[in-house]
Amino acid sequence: MPNADSRFGRLGWLVLSLLVLVIDQVSKAHFEGSLEMFQQIVVIPDYFSWTLAYNTGAAFSFLADGGGWQRWLFAVIAVVVSAVLVVWLKRLGRDDTWLAIALALVLGGALGNLYDRIALGHVIDFILVHWQNRHYFPAFNFADSAITVGAIMLALDMFKSKKTGETVND
């Protein structure tokens, strides 16, 4: 009889995805309930603020003015990517911890933004990084941060694998 690890692969890492999803949704609810649209609360003067913004597009508001169809396009993409990530996680070996964490972070972030997109028609953003109140990076959220960290980890794993034939955690 196969053990749980061989049957389910690294699906235990879905707990990390769930944690990302919960932190993302709780933080979005907090800022949506405590800020007015585009209001800024300065955390670190000239560098970092909390805000409230809705994004109907993708990263950097890509296709935000699409008229509504983009909501469903990005939702379908998120569902497909999430399914691929779950299958990938399931197939990982016992020693693929670095890769499992990366995939779980991306999955949790994708699900957090997918929920917003389907339930609300937009993604809630609340983190604002800027330089001297003049040069602003687009607002983002916890899910976006998890996706970014996971993607960087995936890239590092690929570069390490390509260079040495081993994964980062080998």
Curated annotation (Swiss-Prot):
Q: Which GO terms describe its cellular component?
A: plasma membrane
Name the family.
Answer: Belongs to the peptidase A8 family.
Name the UniProt key words of this record, in alphabetical order.
Aspartyl protease, Cell inner membrane, Cell membrane, Hydrolase, Membrane, Protease, Transmembrane, Transmembrane helix
Q: Which GO terms describe its molecular function?
A: aspartic-type endopeptidase activity
What's the name of the protein?
Lipoprotein signal peptidase
What Enzyme Commission number does this protein have?
3.4.23.36
The broad enzyme category this protein falls into is: hydrolase
Listed Pfam families = Peptidase_A8
Q: Which InterPro entries match?
A: Peptidase_A8
Query: Which regions span the lipid bilayer?
Result: 11-31, 41-61, 69-89, 95-115, 136-156
Per the Swiss-Prot or TrEMBL record, the active site comprises 125, 144
In terms of superkingdom, the source organism counts as Bacteria
What does it catalyze?
Release of signal peptides from bacterial membrane prolipoproteins. Hydrolyzes -Xaa-Yaa-Zaa-|-(S,diacylglyceryl)Cys-, in which Xaa is hydrophobic (preferably Leu), and Yaa (Ala or Ser) and Zaa (Gly or Ala) have small, neutral side chains
